[in-house]
Amino acid sequence: MKRIELIMGRNNPDGGRVSDYMINEFIRNEIMPHFEYGTFIDGEGLWKGEYEKTKIFYIEVADTEAIATAVLLRHVADRYRKQFRQESVLVSEVETSTSWIT
């Protein structure tokens, strides 16, 4: 299993911010149509010494789905970067030991 994470900062280089409404609309239009499950987390972090809020989306997928999922999330990251004038958006892929308890 792999965990693929998309970490979206909410500060703009011009000093603006990505509002709750703006990021929720992005999630609704650009992320939710592509995935049947996944987790969103509100976070905080630093970018170039500046504090910023972040929105994190992560999904656990089978190894056979990891490449396609990572490619899709990289496309989503690029749309977020362009739409909200971000310097960069982080996509991380981590090997996990995960079990679904059903």
Question: Which ranges hold each PLM region?
Answer:
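Terminal, regulation- and interaction-focused segments at domain boundaries
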Residues: 1-18
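Generic alpha-helix detector with strongest preference for long hydrophobic helices that associate
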Residues: 7-8, 12, 38, 57, ...
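Short, catalytically relevant binding-site loops at active-site mouths
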Residues: 11-14, 45, 97-98
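Ordered, soluble secondary-structure elements with a strong preference for glycine-centered loop motifs
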Residues: 17-22, 67-70
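Short amphipathic alpha-helical segments
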Residues: 22-34
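Short, intrinsically disordered low-complexity segments
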Residues: 33-63
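Helix-rich interaction surfaces within compact, conserved domain-sized segments
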Residues: 53-102
